[in-house]
């Protein structure tokens, strides 16, 4: 297996955007290591959860460092995952490698679930209220909703049973992500890596080792350096200050919001007046990635020759960034009015991305 990976024929012209996958693998390994070490000192007892985090920071040798590496590592993991998905979208990997794309989207979904469960574990104010608000979305499911919420909570409110099962699932899911990542790599080896030109010819390829292992090592060092700088100099940059306050069911935070990497979906959820409609839009904002391989009917034109596709892609990127900003804003005007049209634009761009290939293909045939 290792020999197969090292001798993988890799295109000579791949850019830095092809480094994201290996960087994600490194961060996943780091998250597994720090997570296992932290779990040795964490207590999922309702009365002890917040105190155990304080204990890790104050009393465990290097505990503060492990916790901050784990928390900020999750943010970097999603940052590079979005860059990885963006590269796949831009260079149309969903057409060239549909199975790789499908497994990748599944990894993304499981990662989001894992991150949400981990966000609840410190049992701070935002942990408690975030868990209450997000799990309560299940009540929008017709007929079965209220029963599903109580089943997830393990009672009539978020409490000890909720925290216990969230801790168990948060511990298990990263191993599922690792298995899916291995499947992702196996499917990638079926055709080999794509490149900016979109061809899969083996004439201009070199073995992965040593050329690209050295290149990836540079990326590892740079990313690890950035993670250390954030951890040492600005540890709370990507964290929510509300979570430094112990959970109190009697005091509601002024603004309940998830971590920054979920804000685009949160903005889409809030933009729909109907609760059920908002939940459906929230799910579809991610599940729509599954439908991309079906949208182009196997016709792939190199992105350098498809100006329409490039314009649509960058409109989607800008829309995503603005939705992320809106998700962090208060629930008031003009932010609510902006979220509606941008949600529509977000879904429209995915539809047009698939159609643009066929449109461009027909225009070329006409010429």
Swiss-Prot record:
Keyword terms of this UniProt record: Electron transport, Heme, Iron, Membrane, Metal-binding, Mitochondrion, Mitochondrion inner membrane, Respiratory chain, Transmembrane, Transmembrane helix, Transport, Ubiquinone
Binding-site list for heme b b562: 70, 170
This protein's name: Cytochrome b
Remaining remarks: Heme 1 (or BL or b562) is low-potential and absorbs at about 562 nm, and heme 2 (or BH or b566) is high-potential and absorbs at about 566 nm.
Function: Component of the ubiquinol-cytochrome c reductase complex (complex III or cytochrome b-c1 complex) that is part of the mitochondrial respiratory chain. The b-c1 complex mediates electron transfer from ubiquinol to cytochrome c. Contributes to the generation of a proton gradient across the mitochondrial membrane that is then used for ATP synthesis.
Listed transmembrane segments: 20-40, 64-85, 101-121, 166-186, 214-234, 276-296, 308-328, 335-355
Residues at which heme b b566 binds: 84, 184
Biological process, per Gene Ontology: mitochondrial electron transport, ubiquinol to cytochrome c
GO CC, alphabetical: mitochondrial inner membrane; respiratory chain complex III
Cell location: Mitochondrion inner membrane
Textual note on the cofactor: Binds 2 heme b groups non-covalently.
Record Pfam families: Cytochrom_B_C (PF00032), Cytochrome_B (PF00033)
GO terms for MF: metal ion binding; ubiquinol-cytochrome-c reductase activity
Organism encoding this protein: Albinaria caerulea
Domain of life, per lineage: Eukaryota
Membrane topology note: Multi-pass membrane protein
Family of the protein in this entry: Belongs to the cytochrome b family.
